[in-house]
Amino acid sequence: MPRLRRVSRLLLAVGLAAGSATCGTDDLTRESPDGLRPDLAAGPPERLAITRQPPGSALDQEVWEPGRQPTVVVRDGAGVKVPGAVVTASIAGGGGSLQGSLTKTTNANGIAAFTDLGIAGAGTHTLRFSAGTAGVTSSSLVLNPLPPEAQTGKWDPPVPWDIVPLHLSLMPTGKLLGWGKYEPDGRMGMPRLWNPSAGPPTGASMIHADTMLFCAGHALMADGRLMVSGGHKDDDRGLDVTNIFDPVTESWIGGLPRMAKGRWYPTVTTLADGRLVTVAGRDTTSTVVLVPEIWEGGRWVELPGASLRLPYYPRQFLAPNGKVFYAGERVQARWLDVDAVTAKGRGRWSTSSSLVHLWPFNRDYGSAVMYDTGRILVVGGGGDLNWSTPDPRSSTPTATAETIDLNGSGPRWSATDQMHFPRRHLNATVLPDGKVLVTGGTSSGGFNTMAGAVRAAEAWDPETGRWTLLASNAVDRVYHSVSLLLPDGTVLHGASGDANVPNTAQRYPREPSHEVFRPPYLFRGTRPTVTGLSKTVVTWGERFNVSTPNAAQITRVRWIRLGSVTHAFDTNQRANTLAFSVGSGVVKVTVPNNSRRAPPGHYVLFLLNRNGVPSTGTIVQVR
């Protein structure tokens, strides 16, 4: 008799097989315990059971963790598991909108595993899972409203330093190297190396430097060392020294070749091949330095063909065409080709009537950031009537912002929304979710009017072009303030002052402290988790794997170059949105295809879900 039932079931299965086209090759080769292929043994779906319920509680719109995503088993009328059945999820009760991939196909064991569900709409809900005419309803799920911080972010209380860290760089080791002008007792300021995971920065290791690094330029080199160009001889007078900090030995490298000229307030930019170019500043006699110098072969080489007067700390970036793009603070933008040869020698600046900002006045002490490949946001600045070509309509800074796209045949300018506050001495920091955070600064005219200090942060969204007002910090941070993205996705905003009021013996208030801003995305549910990388040193065009249980939930991958910031400009910061594909438990990431888009060095890699919630960052080197 058992043999007869078995033959009957086989004949029935053969009849059903002609209409089945939903199972894969792997399913056709698997066998059930009684030796029958499950796709041939099963009839149409008639019974569904939830083998893992949705979470009992979650946040509104949260993408539920992989271990809390529902799974459903599908059986036919005889209790045989049905592979290849399409299961659809929907809201059964409580209203709201179900988000994520709403249909899943059962595997060879008849299991449909959902991967990225979430519900928009606070309250109590139930879900319905259906396959054919069969269905099952989940247990209740309570969705709690998002906290206010999911819209505004949140500031941690101020944390003291022994110095004012108005120069600050994130090292590939995860430590922060910072320095100011003075020690608390008035002596020459010495750098501090701080490990954020080891406690507060008070008492952080002092890394002795032989020269005063205040008002130098700096950028991270391709190998992760920090190049520091110039320094402070006196106000408006720069040093010709070169200092390189090694984060592995945690020491300065001595005996390096000097520059041809001293530099006070220069900008250092890392090029596509790892060379560095330093421009602008004032020399030991307070004369404006016209000729750039390039660091190559372990020494500085002048570029006399590129002689040009530029403002302090020029806002410039390596562009996708391999040249350096000068984006301000002056109205006229320019290109620098370090390898061109002219009648005056090596190097050449070029410009045209079309390379002009939309805002027709100088943005002194405004900020700029490359928020994605070849795309720059220029924001704020101006307001000092003692500065050249001030805005005659106003003695206050501007709230305007504009974008520059360097990806085409020529730069393209576009106007974007204005900030909620005019600002100078602001900092612009690119975030993992693609937005740009602006912190600090003053809204009043004059060089550094403390009465106009702005504590409210705001964020610009490149997808909408709009600014969102965020939470306010506790301390006024204006001239000499800094902001820096940390690998955990928070932003350190610190320093201010530690300098003399121009043309007086008075000093601005010192702020030897920092505050940490936790952006809104950190209050929108559980973060994706990274469990490992196939490699942490990659090259251009290469693919590498990021292991994560959240692979099916990842909608965006970005990396952001380690920051090195001072005087309202992060010379090292730039971001790329990376191509990727998803496998089982893995995200396969593709590195940009050339070093003009992603210059050699270290980046913090983030995986993001559809709500813009990032993983904790992982530092990756491209070379």
Task: Write out the residue ranges for each language-model feature.
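Exposed beta-strand face motif in extracellular beta-rich ectodomains
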Residues: 123-127, 601-603
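Short, acidic Ser/Thr/Gly-rich low-complexity loop/linker segments typical of extracellular
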Residues: 100-111
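C-terminal motif of bacterial Sec signal peptides marking the signal peptidase cleavage site
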Residues: 19-22
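Extracellular/surface recognition and adhesion modules
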Residues: 50, 72, 89, 110, ...
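Short S/T/G/P-enriched beta-strand
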Residues: 30-83, 93-98, 124, 132-147
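Bacterial signal peptide processing site
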Residues: 24-27
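Kelch-like beta-propeller repeat domains
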Residues: 144-623
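Bacterial N-terminal signal peptides that target proteins for export
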Residues: 1-11
